[in-house]
Regions:
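Local sequence-structure signature of Cys/Sec-based thiol-disulfide redox active-site neighborhoods
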Residues: 1-31
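Structural microenvironment flanking redox-active thiols in thiol-disulfide oxidoreductases
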Residues: 7-11, 40-47
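Non-catalytic, surface beta->alpha helical segment in thiol-disulfide oxidoreductase systems
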Residues: 61-88
Length: 88
C-alpha cells in the first residue's frame, strides 16, 4: 500500500495549514493510502535525519515497495494536492 508521511514540528503554523490541506485533498480523491504523521526536531529526531528532512512541513509519498515517489517541502493548496494525489 502507498504511504503518505507528513513531517512537522510543534508550533508550526505552516504545518497546521498543510495538514488541513492534505486532509481536505485526501477526502476529495479516491486513493488507497496509509497516512503517518511524524512530529520532531530537524537535525535531532532520528526519523527526520533518516529521511533527510531539512524543512517542515515536508510530505513524502512512497509507493507499494516503499520507494519515495513524491516529496513536497512547504505548504501547497488543496487544489494542487488533489491534482498530485489523484495521479498516484
Amino acid at each position: 500500500m502507498k504511504s503518505l508521511i507528513f513531517y512537522s514540528k510543534a508550533n508550526c503554523p505552516a504545518c497546521a495549514i498543510m495538514a488541513s490541506n492534505i486532509d481536505h485533498a485526501l477526502n476529495a480523491v479516491n486513493v488507497d493510502i496509509n497516512i503517518r504523521l511524524r512530529h520532531g526536531v530537524i537535525g535531532k529526531t532520528k526519523t527526520f535525519i533518516d529521511n533527510n528532512i531539512k524543512q517542515v512541513p515536508t510530505t513524502i509519498v512512497k509507493d507499494d515497495d516503499g520507494k519515495e515517489v513524491l516529496r513536497l517541502v512547504g505548504t501547497y493548496t488543496v487544489e494542487y494536492l488533489i491534482g498530485v494525489l489523484s495521479r498516484l
